């Protein structure tokens, strides 16, 4: 049994972590740290200890792992002001780049802990499982990169693609976080659809950096906001090196992900649906070939708050501690 802390427990991701970890059979005690608890009654449980962030200094040595559910730049600031725990899983982008200069270029923040970057593993289990198993520090991937990389990985692994990948990705408004903005308020998002951060979204460099570790591919990434609360749907278009059929591509994806509990591969004629992954740690994928252009057309659907954030973080925790990977994560979708 382990004791787990969550710093930043009152945001959307922190709340999802709390919900999942509260029912996790190997979590003995859950420590929630936040300066913004408004409805503390929802955390009433013998298994939960609730406090503001100031008590972290007294308690961190008692914790086996800490989740940082903070915004980019905030985890760095918190760790500069407090002790580094024995193990952590960071939900921000603060440790996703090995090169501190690249992080500064993308986020406009000078990295204050460059010596720690080489010790942090990028937490995409289906690709980097063995590294995660031996890691003490995990950088949880972004939601868009999770969907995009899971869609591209089988092609890159088998050297079937080259050139430029086009990723056309739609997200629900929870991806913007709990703090309201002009784009996320109901009056502006309802019955609306728009692209944002066009050609300069911060997740594009993250995707490209990890793609370089897998192989090599350039990425054109355009995110869009759709009027749903949770979910990501990524449409990926990428040229193929050789002529293969949709059925052959389907079998290739099935083979690559045959042992992956959370990856569901649909037949070529089917499309994933956001509604059928809500509340799950699944990534549902379909892949087919456009014969006219010899491009692979890949669709990926995930819940941005679960597989794109909290669920994947708990999946990483399970790997770190040698638990069954699906422990505490075996959810059916919130459907209908």
Swiss-Prot record:
Q: What is its main location?
A: cytoplasm
Pathway(s) of this molecule: Amino-acid biosynthesis; L-arginine biosynthesis; N(2)-acetyl-L-ornithine from L-glutamate: step 3/4
**GO terms under biological process:** L-arginine biosynthetic process
Q: Which GO terms describe its cellular component?
A: cytoplasm
Q: Which domain of life is it from?
A: Bacteria
Q: Which GO terms describe its molecular function?
A: N-acetyl-gamma-glutamyl-phosphate reductase activity; NAD binding; NADP+ binding
Instruction: Show the catalytic activity.
Output: N-acetyl-L-glutamate 5-semialdehyde + phosphate + NADP(+) = N-acetyl-L-glutamyl 5-phosphate + NADPH + H(+)
| Gene3D superfamilies registered for this protein in UniProt | Dihydrodipicolinate Reductase, domain 2, NAD(P)-binding Rossmann-like Domain
Q: Provide the top EC class.
A: oxidoreductase
Alphabetized, the UniProt keywords read: Amino-acid biosynthesis, Arginine biosynthesis, Cytoplasm, NADP, Oxidoreductase
Which residues are named in the active-site annotation? Answer: 143
Question: Mind telling me which SUPFAM superfamilies this protein's record contains?
Answer: Glyceraldehyde-3-phosphate dehydrogenase-like, C-terminal domain, NAD(P)-binding Rossmann-fold domains
Q: Which family does it belong to?
A: Belongs to the NAGSA dehydrogenase family. Type 1 subfamily.
> What functional role does this protein have?
Catalyzes the NADPH-dependent reduction of N-acetyl-5-glutamyl phosphate to yield N-acetyl-L-glutamate 5-semialdehyde.
Q: What is this protein called?
A: N-acetyl-gamma-glutamyl-phosphate reductase
Source organism per UniProt: Dictyoglomus thermophilum (strain ATCC 35947 / DSM 3960 / H-6-12)
């Amino acid at each position: 049994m382990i004791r787990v802390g969550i710093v930043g427990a009152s945001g959307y991701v922190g709340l999802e972590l709390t919900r999942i970890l509260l029912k996790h059979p190997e979590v003995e005690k859950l420590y929630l740290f936040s300066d913004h608890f408004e409805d503390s009654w929802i955390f009433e449980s013998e298994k939960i200890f609730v406090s503001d962030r100031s008590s972290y200094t007294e308690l961190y040595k008692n914790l086996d792992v800490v989740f940082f559910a903070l915004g980019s730049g905030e985890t760095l600031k918190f760790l500069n002001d407090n002790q580094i725990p024995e193990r952590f899983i960071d939900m921000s982008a603060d440790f996703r780049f090995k090169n501190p200069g690249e992080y500064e270029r993308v986020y406009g923040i000078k990295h204050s802990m460059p010596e720690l970057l080489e010790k942090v593993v990028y937490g995409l289990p289906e690709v980097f499982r063995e590294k995660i198993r031996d890691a003490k520090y995990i950088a949880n991937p972004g939601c868009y990169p999770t969907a995009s990389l899971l869609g591209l990985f089988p092609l890159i692994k088998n050297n079937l693609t080259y050139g430029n990948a086009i990723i056309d990705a739609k997200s629900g408004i929870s991806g913007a976080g709990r703090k309201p903005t002009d784009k996320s308020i109901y009056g502006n998002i309802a019955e609306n659809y728009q692209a944002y951060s066009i050609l300069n979204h911060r997740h594009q460099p993250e995707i490209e950096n990890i793609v370089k570790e897998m192989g090599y591919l350039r990425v054109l990434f355009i995110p869009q906001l759709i009027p749903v609360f949770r979910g990501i749907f990524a449409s990926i278009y990428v040229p193929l090196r050789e002529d293969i059929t949709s059925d052959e591509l389907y079998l290739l994806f099935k083979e690559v992900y045959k042992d992956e509990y959370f990856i569901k591969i649909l037949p070529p004629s089917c499309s994933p649906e956001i509604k059928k992954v809500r509340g799950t740690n699944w990534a549902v994928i379909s892949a087919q070939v456009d014969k006219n252009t010899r491009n692979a057309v890949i669709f990926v659907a995930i819940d941005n708050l679960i597989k794109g954030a909290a669920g994947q973080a708990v999946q990483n925790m399970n790997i770190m501690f040698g638990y069954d990977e699906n422990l505490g994560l075996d959810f059916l979708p919130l459907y209908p």
